[in-house]
Structure formats: structure tokens, C-alpha cells
């Protein structure tokens, strides 16, 4: 018998959805992404500075719902599931102050965001304006980072890498429309 594996779905630019966070959460996606700016002392969510709205805070759209759900679900993302949730935080403004503000906010809820406190905690992955690998240690250990394909990480730095990103166009010219043809599947090693 073959064990059933969950399909890992990522909600890219989740804040653009009709119901940010909730729409993806209801589908039990594996990963939700929010683009975050530190703007006027607040962590705001949006794709560009001109898109920012004072009511679209990272705390209100993502952190508070997660804190509520973890309280309701016995310390896990979904009450009847052992699956973990990943929250990708794409830093869109200056790395250090933005990440410090994110860490300060998440640090108020270790039972939700720190796997050392709760093994079922949300996995936090920082992408976008990722700090230099030498600076990873400045941030709490529960914050992990999106790595780059050609970086030369030390073993300690590699421990902080959650995933490695690469430009898809380096491997295939498929534009995502229609079915992928056999040549592109072969190029990706998926046939």
C-alpha cells in the first residue's frame, strides 16, 4: 500500500485574495505568503508601497487569526490534522528594521510561532529581502530563510535555510499556461 501524501499548495501573494488568510486556511494549504513593509512604524501588507492601506496590517490579517486558531485548536493549525502551516513573510522594505519588527511581533506568541515551545507551531520563512547569511544569528532561531541556489552556506547557516529558490526560467521556458509538454517535463526531471 502506498501512503497518501498531502498536496503542498502555496498561496502566493495571499493578501490579494477576497478573504486574505481565511480563503487559503479553509483549503488547508501548506504555505501562505504575505508581502510585508515596515511603513510608518506599522507592518503593512501589500505588493507595492502605493498599494498599502492602514487597515491591511500583518498583525490583523495573519498573526491575530493564527493566535486565535491555535487557541481554539489545541495548539495546532487545524484541530483534526497533523499537518503544519508555513507562513512565508516576504520582506519588501529595508531588511533589518522590517525583520526586527516581524520578530518582535511573532515573539509575543511563542506557542504559535516557535517550534521549540510548540512542535506544532507555524513555520516562519523569510523571503524577499533576506539578510546576509552571516546575520542569520541576529534573529530568533524559529525564523528560517529562503536560500539562493548558488550561495555557499556554512553548516550553521544551512540549518536556517527552509528552502532554496531558483528561477524557473533557468530550467524551462514553459509559461504556466496549458499543459506542460513532455520536453519540459524531461528538462525538469519530472517525466
Question: Predicted segment positions?
Answer:
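Catalytic cores of phosphodiester-bond hydrolases, prominently lipid phosphodiesterases
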Residues: 2-15, 20-33, 37-191
